[in-house]
Amino acid sequence: MERAVQKLAVAKRLFEDGFYADAVSRAYYAMFYAARALLSEKSVYPKTHRGVISQFGLKFVKEGKFEKEIFDLFTRAQEDREEADYGLFSEIVEKEAKKIIEGAEKFLKECEKRR
């Protein structure tokens, strides 16, 4: 979880400096590392980003151990992260970046409760 917390701190700093796309990317990675940490406690080690999302959905959301609304923040962040990192003509605006960072804060808080 330490890595997740670090990524969230970086996301907030990037946001403050106006680097919204990079902030979204780091906020997503905060959620990604938090999800991996919880999955590792169940001895589940997916090799891909989609695998982490899929397994997290199966092991935590489907089993009723994690709210779907908060999990949806993770899936949305993954889509925005791909757009931020690979989209040639996309622009992540301040409002969207703020929403993703707030989602990452909620996601990490919920993950911490389950450790």
Where are these regions (language model features)?
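Terminal alpha-helical segments
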Residues: 1-115
